[in-house]
Amino acid sequence: MISLPHGGRRLALSACVYLAASLAWAADDAFQPLFPEDGPPRGWRVTTWNDLARPAEDAAWSVRDGVLRSSEQRGTWLVSEKQYEDFVLEFEIKLTTHGNSGVALRAPLKGDPAFDGMELQVADLRYNTQAKDSELTGGIYRAVAPSKQVYQPTEWNRFRIELKGPRLKVTLNDELIQDVDLGEFDQPVKRHDGSDAPPVKDRPGRGHIGFQHLSRDNEPVLIRNARIKELK
């Protein structure tokens, strides 16, 4: 029997934990891949970043070698044609130093998902050094701050978003950062033009999902292993 030193045992344990998490990530057959083929994403539309009713150039997003990539065209959403109500959404995302993205949740096909649906913010800390807590990665934009910051700059970051009724749970890199009842958030939030947007509790309970590209300096948004499971 080989005895590992303390540091070796800790490293081996960490490797086992990571392997178990990876196997759990891959095991559930109820999940459907969102981008199973290379090329233009099928079942998705490209729109402008502040109004999903306004189309943008389709070539702004594409899948290559299993990775969804934004083009240099800043200010777009890639939005699902399908609507979702209760679901688990999992994906990995990678941004560069001035990266800014987001995840549309239950968004209508008009208006700004950040205020007319919900947007889970994903942004490098260097994108906006004056950002409020609810504008940081893992926050429901300008409405619900995450409990902690575990975003890893310029690395692949793994998200699990679970929405069932008003309950939202968000796990980032195996850390729970949101576990809230959205029905408790009854205060309006300010849009970019200073007008009031509806409180989170009054946002739609069903809608579209999407991924945003708002990075600076032509820096891309990269997404892989994106999949979704609808909940009954």
Task: Label the predicted regions.
Residues 1-15:
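Bacterial N-terminal signal peptides that target proteins for export
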Residues 25-232:
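Carbohydrate-interacting regions of secretory-pathway proteins
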Residues 17-26:
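Hydrophobic h-region of N-terminal signal peptides that target proteins for export
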